[in-house]
């Protein structure tokens, strides 16, 4: 159990993290929530604390993921135009962003492996942290290449499958954490493993199972659950359309501005 002094410091860090969130200073929000995680002394984080940690990291990583996608798109355009000098500059800049992405992912994955996953006691917290572990390995797989990409993909699959096993046995099909896991797991199949059939099957099964039990959904999680269900359906529509286009014309490539599958919402 945490000592009274540690508990007081913990409350202070949580308050500072909320202040940082309001000020949109997400790097500092991460620092405060890391201090909270290290102050709990084998206790679980509260639901509020784990959500703050998730939001902090999601914003910090999200900004870099967006930057990386923009720079990669520009790199492709400059390559197609034969602007080798520009391509060289862009690659150096992309490498800088990739270093930041790696550092952020390594930070949260270390926290998950050493503190958060081992301390998780309830079914929903186990799924929450294992899903988070899968997410950050997936973010690494988005930009790594060769063996590093393969390793990141394998770590993602292992974490998501472990989370899925617990979710299927301990969480209702309408539980927002279970739905969020299905959403992100299906995006992994589609984007990283290039398996649209498995992505669609997973998303459709999660959606159908949730629809069947929609009348049992409590008011407190109705908004979160139905929002993720909508994202699952949006992805299914997008992926089904893409698969039909591929059948019609296998050689046709996606336009640079093609719609991206929806990842989980920031909450």
Swiss-Prot record:
Tell me which Gene3D superfamilies the record gives: 14-3-3 domain
Keyword set, alphabetical order: Acetylation, Cytoplasm, Nucleus, Phosphoprotein
A biological process (GO) of this protein is:
regulation of metabolic process
User: Gene Ontology cellular component?
Assistant: cytoplasm; nucleus
Predominant localisation class: nucleus
**Which residues are modified to N-acetylalanine?**
2
Q: Which residues carry this modification: Phosphoserine?
A: 72, 195, 267
Consequences of knocking out this gene: Disturbed levels of several metabolites (e.g. beta-alanine, aspartate, pyroglutamate, glutamate, glutamine, alpha-ketoglutarate, palmitate and shikimate).
What positions are modified (Phosphothreonine)?
A: 216
Pfam families named in the record = 14-3-3 (PF00244)
* Record localization: Nucleus; Cytoplasm
- Superkingdom of this entry's organism? Eukaryota
The UniProt entry's sequence similarity note says: Belongs to the 14-3-3 family.
- Whom does it interact with, and what assembly results? Interacts with TPK1. Interacts with the isocitrate dehydrogenase IDH3, and malate dehydrogenases MDH1 and MDH2. Interacts with DREB1A and DREB1B in the nucleus. Interacts with CINV1.
Task performed by this protein:
Is associated with a DNA binding complex that binds to the G box, a well-characterized cis-acting DNA regulatory element found in plant genes. Involved in the regulation of nutrient metabolism.
**Designated name of the protein:** 14-3-3-like protein GF14 chi
Per the UniProt entry, what species is this protein from, by scientific name?
Answer: Arabidopsis thaliana (Mouse-ear cress)
Lineage here is: Eukaryota, Viridiplantae, Streptophyta, Embryophyta, Tracheophyta
From the UniProt record, report the name of the gene that encodes this protein: GRF1
